[in-house]
A protein has these predicted regions:
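Terminal targeting segments of Actinobacterial cell-envelope proteins
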Residues: 1-26
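Solvent-exposed, non-transmembrane regions of membrane-associated and secreted proteins
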Residues: 21, 27-28, 38-252
Length: 252
Protein backbone atom coordinates (compact mmCIF):
# COMPACT_ATOMS: atom_id res chain seq x y z
CA UNK A 1 0.00 0.00 0.00
CA UNK A 2 1.41 3.35 -1.02
CA UNK A 3 1.84 5.89 1.79
CA UNK A 4 0.09 9.27 1.54
CA UNK A 5 2.28 12.07 0.23
CA UNK A 6 2.39 15.35 2.23
CA UNK A 7 3.49 18.81 1.14
CA UNK A 8 6.66 18.39 3.25
CA UNK A 9 7.61 15.30 1.17
CA UNK A 10 6.74 16.63 -2.29
CA UNK A 11 7.16 20.32 -3.14
CA UNK A 12 4.89 19.88 -6.14
CA UNK A 13 1.75 19.49 -4.09
CA UNK A 14 -0.56 22.57 -3.97
CA UNK A 15 0.22 23.57 -0.34
CA UNK A 16 3.89 24.40 -0.95
CA UNK A 17 3.51 27.18 -3.56
CA UNK A 18 0.94 28.96 -1.39
CA UNK A 19 3.38 29.01 1.55
CA UNK A 20 6.21 30.17 -0.68
CA UNK A 21 4.13 33.02 -2.12
CA UNK A 22 3.11 34.09 1.39
CA UNK A 23 6.71 34.30 2.55
CA UNK A 24 7.66 36.21 -0.59
CA UNK A 25 4.89 38.72 0.09
CA UNK A 26 6.09 39.14 3.66
CA UNK A 27 9.60 39.80 2.35
CA UNK A 28 8.37 42.45 -0.10
CA UNK A 29 6.32 44.18 2.60
CA UNK A 30 9.32 44.12 4.92
CA UNK A 31 11.53 45.73 2.28
CA UNK A 32 8.90 48.40 1.63
CA UNK A 33 8.64 49.18 5.34
CA UNK A 34 12.42 49.50 5.59
CA UNK A 35 12.44 51.82 2.56
CA UNK A 36 9.66 53.96 4.02
CA UNK A 37 11.52 54.12 7.33
CA UNK A 38 14.72 55.27 5.63
CA UNK A 39 12.81 57.93 3.67
CA UNK A 40 11.13 59.18 6.85
CA UNK A 41 14.47 59.35 8.66
CA UNK A 42 15.96 61.33 5.77
CA UNK A 43 12.98 63.70 5.82
CA UNK A 44 13.33 64.23 9.57
CA UNK A 45 17.05 64.89 9.16
CA UNK A 46 16.26 67.37 6.38
CA UNK A 47 13.69 69.21 8.50
CA UNK A 48 15.58 69.22 11.80
CA UNK A 49 19.10 69.78 10.53
CA UNK A 50 19.50 70.66 6.87
CA UNK A 51 16.85 73.42 6.74
CA UNK A 52 18.71 75.11 9.61
CA UNK A 53 22.01 74.85 7.75
CA UNK A 54 20.49 76.39 4.62
CA UNK A 55 18.70 79.11 6.61
CA UNK A 56 21.85 80.05 8.54
CA UNK A 57 23.77 80.41 5.29
CA UNK A 58 21.00 82.52 3.77
CA UNK A 59 20.90 84.75 6.86
CA UNK A 60 24.67 85.24 6.71
CA UNK A 61 24.36 86.33 3.09
CA UNK A 62 21.67 88.83 4.05
CA UNK A 63 23.88 90.29 6.79
CA UNK A 64 26.83 90.68 4.43
CA UNK A 65 24.69 92.37 1.79
CA UNK A 66 23.04 94.67 4.34
CA UNK A 67 26.30 95.77 5.94
CA UNK A 68 27.73 96.40 2.49
CA UNK A 69 24.75 98.61 1.64
CA UNK A 70 25.24 100.54 4.90
CA UNK A 71 28.84 101.24 3.93
CA UNK A 72 27.69 103.12 0.82
CA UNK A 73 25.92 106.50 0.66
CA UNK A 74 22.12 106.13 0.87
CA UNK A 75 21.69 107.83 -2.50
CA UNK A 76 23.70 105.05 -4.14
CA UNK A 77 21.36 102.27 -3.00
CA UNK A 78 18.21 103.07 -4.90
CA UNK A 79 16.07 102.31 -1.84
CA UNK A 80 12.52 103.37 -1.23
CA UNK A 81 10.87 106.40 0.31
CA UNK A 82 12.53 107.85 3.40
CA UNK A 83 10.56 108.25 6.61
CA UNK A 84 11.47 110.02 9.83
CA UNK A 85 12.22 107.44 12.51
CA UNK A 86 13.86 107.82 15.91
CA UNK A 87 17.13 109.73 15.66
CA UNK A 88 17.11 110.08 11.90
CA UNK A 89 15.76 108.91 8.58
CA UNK A 90 15.33 105.34 7.45
CA UNK A 91 14.68 104.23 3.91
CA UNK A 92 11.41 102.33 3.71
CA UNK A 93 12.55 98.84 2.68
CA UNK A 94 11.48 97.09 -0.46
CA UNK A 95 9.49 93.89 -0.06
CA UNK A 96 11.82 91.00 0.69
CA UNK A 97 14.84 93.20 1.47
CA UNK A 98 16.80 93.06 4.72
CA UNK A 99 16.87 96.45 6.42
CA UNK A 100 17.83 95.87 10.08
CA UNK A 101 19.71 93.55 12.42
CA UNK A 102 18.23 92.22 15.66
CA UNK A 103 20.03 91.29 18.87
CA UNK A 104 18.40 89.64 21.90
CA UNK A 105 20.93 89.03 24.72
CA UNK A 106 18.72 86.35 26.31
CA UNK A 107 18.64 84.48 22.99
CA UNK A 108 22.14 85.43 21.84
CA UNK A 109 22.90 81.94 20.53
CA UNK A 110 20.15 82.40 17.94
CA UNK A 111 19.34 86.11 17.67
CA UNK A 112 22.55 88.08 17.53
CA UNK A 113 22.92 90.18 14.40
CA UNK A 114 19.99 88.33 12.81
CA UNK A 115 18.70 90.07 9.65
CA UNK A 116 15.19 91.52 9.62
CA UNK A 117 13.48 91.34 6.22
CA UNK A 118 10.48 93.25 4.92
CA UNK A 119 8.19 90.22 4.56
CA UNK A 120 6.61 87.41 6.54
CA UNK A 121 6.27 85.06 3.56
CA UNK A 122 7.67 81.58 4.21
CA UNK A 123 10.59 81.83 1.75
CA UNK A 124 11.71 85.05 3.45
CA UNK A 125 11.29 83.64 6.96
CA UNK A 126 13.83 81.02 5.89
CA UNK A 127 16.37 83.87 5.50
CA UNK A 128 15.91 85.60 8.84
CA UNK A 129 13.30 87.42 10.92
CA UNK A 130 10.32 88.83 9.05
CA UNK A 131 8.78 92.29 9.52
CA UNK A 132 5.05 92.66 8.95
CA UNK A 133 5.04 95.25 6.13
CA UNK A 134 1.79 96.82 7.34
CA UNK A 135 3.34 97.69 10.71
CA UNK A 136 5.68 100.47 11.71
CA UNK A 137 9.46 100.62 11.29
CA UNK A 138 11.90 100.54 14.23
CA UNK A 139 11.62 103.57 16.48
CA UNK A 140 8.35 104.78 14.98
CA UNK A 141 5.22 105.45 17.00
CA UNK A 142 3.01 102.40 16.74
CA UNK A 143 4.02 98.77 16.51
CA UNK A 144 7.20 97.38 14.97
CA UNK A 145 5.99 93.77 14.61
CA UNK A 146 8.11 90.82 13.54
CA UNK A 147 7.77 87.06 13.12
CA UNK A 148 10.24 84.18 13.09
CA UNK A 149 10.30 80.40 13.05
CA UNK A 150 10.52 78.50 16.31
CA UNK A 151 11.36 75.14 14.73
CA UNK A 152 13.38 74.40 11.57
CA UNK A 153 14.43 76.93 8.90
CA UNK A 154 16.89 78.64 11.21
CA UNK A 155 14.46 78.75 14.17
CA UNK A 156 15.52 82.21 15.49
CA UNK A 157 12.76 82.23 18.13
CA UNK A 158 13.33 78.61 19.19
CA UNK A 159 13.82 79.60 22.83
CA UNK A 160 11.05 82.18 23.11
CA UNK A 161 10.00 80.41 26.31
CA UNK A 162 13.22 81.64 27.94
CA UNK A 163 12.32 85.32 27.54
CA UNK A 164 11.38 87.27 30.65
CA UNK A 165 9.75 90.59 31.44
CA UNK A 166 12.49 93.23 31.42
CA UNK A 167 14.63 91.53 28.76
CA UNK A 168 16.08 93.80 26.09
CA UNK A 169 15.73 93.61 22.32
CA UNK A 170 18.12 95.69 20.21
CA UNK A 171 17.45 96.68 16.62
CA UNK A 172 20.20 98.13 14.46
CA UNK A 173 19.45 100.16 11.33
CA UNK A 174 21.73 102.22 9.09
CA UNK A 175 22.11 105.23 11.36
CA UNK A 176 20.63 104.19 14.72
CA UNK A 177 20.27 101.64 17.48
CA UNK A 178 16.95 101.04 19.21
CA UNK A 179 16.51 99.32 22.56
CA UNK A 180 13.15 97.80 23.46
CA UNK A 181 12.24 96.42 26.88
CA UNK A 182 9.87 93.45 26.97
CA UNK A 183 6.75 94.09 29.06
CA UNK A 184 4.35 91.16 28.70
CA UNK A 185 3.54 88.03 26.73
CA UNK A 186 0.41 86.12 25.76
CA UNK A 187 -0.59 82.92 23.96
CA UNK A 188 -3.19 83.67 21.28
CA UNK A 189 -4.99 82.08 18.34
CA UNK A 190 -3.38 82.25 14.88
CA UNK A 191 -6.40 84.35 13.84
CA UNK A 192 -5.72 87.07 16.43
CA UNK A 193 -4.33 89.67 14.06
CA UNK A 194 -4.96 92.45 16.56
CA UNK A 195 -1.66 91.63 18.26
CA UNK A 196 0.24 93.60 15.61
CA UNK A 197 -2.10 96.62 15.52
CA UNK A 198 -0.53 100.04 16.24
CA UNK A 199 -2.25 99.85 19.64
CA UNK A 200 -2.79 96.11 20.29
CA UNK A 201 -6.34 95.40 21.41
CA UNK A 202 -7.59 98.91 20.61
CA UNK A 203 -8.66 99.05 16.94
CA UNK A 204 -8.42 102.52 15.45
CA UNK A 205 -6.66 104.04 18.45
CA UNK A 206 -3.95 106.60 17.71
CA UNK A 207 -0.56 105.29 18.87
CA UNK A 208 1.52 107.31 21.30
CA UNK A 209 3.98 104.58 22.32
CA UNK A 210 6.73 102.97 20.26
CA UNK A 211 6.20 99.23 20.56
CA UNK A 212 7.80 96.03 19.38
CA UNK A 213 5.92 92.75 18.94
CA UNK A 214 7.61 89.35 18.60
CA UNK A 215 5.42 86.57 17.19
CA UNK A 216 6.16 82.89 16.75
CA UNK A 217 4.50 79.47 16.72
CA UNK A 218 3.46 77.57 19.84
CA UNK A 219 3.91 74.80 20.87
CA UNK A 220 7.23 74.45 19.15
CA UNK A 221 6.34 71.34 17.15
CA UNK A 222 2.56 71.72 16.88
CA UNK A 223 2.03 75.40 16.03
CA UNK A 224 -1.63 75.42 17.01
CA UNK A 225 -1.30 78.80 18.76
CA UNK A 226 0.98 81.84 18.66
CA UNK A 227 3.31 83.10 21.37
CA UNK A 228 3.40 86.90 21.52
CA UNK A 229 5.81 89.22 23.33
CA UNK A 230 5.27 92.98 23.49
CA UNK A 231 7.87 95.56 24.44
CA UNK A 232 8.33 99.33 24.52
CA UNK A 233 11.13 101.51 23.18
CA UNK A 234 13.40 102.38 26.10
CA UNK A 235 16.46 103.95 24.48
CA UNK A 236 17.97 105.07 21.18
CA UNK A 237 21.51 105.73 20.00
CA UNK A 238 22.69 107.72 17.00
CA UNK A 239 25.56 105.88 15.34
CA UNK A 240 27.20 109.13 14.28
CA UNK A 241 27.53 110.59 17.77
CA UNK A 242 26.84 107.92 20.38
CA UNK A 243 28.76 104.89 21.58
CA UNK A 244 27.51 101.35 21.10
CA UNK A 245 24.87 100.12 23.55
CA UNK A 246 26.73 98.50 26.45
CA UNK A 247 25.02 95.12 25.94
CA UNK A 248 26.05 95.06 22.29
CA UNK A 249 29.62 96.07 23.07
CA UNK A 250 29.84 93.37 25.74
CA UNK A 251 28.52 90.73 23.35
CA UNK A 252 31.03 91.42 20.60
Amino acid sequence: MTAAVTSEQDPQVPGAPRASRAWAAVGVIGELLITVGVVLLLFVAYQLWWTNVVADRAADQQVIALQDSWSRPPSAQGEGEEVQEGNGKQARPKLGDAFALMYIPRLSDKVWGMPVLESVELPDLARGIGHYPETQLPGQKGNFAVAAHRATNGEPFRDVDRLQVGDKVYVEVRDSWFEYTLKRDQIVSPQDGWVIDPVPGEPGAKPVERLITLTTCNPRWASTTRWIWWGELSNTWDKATDKLPAAIKAGR
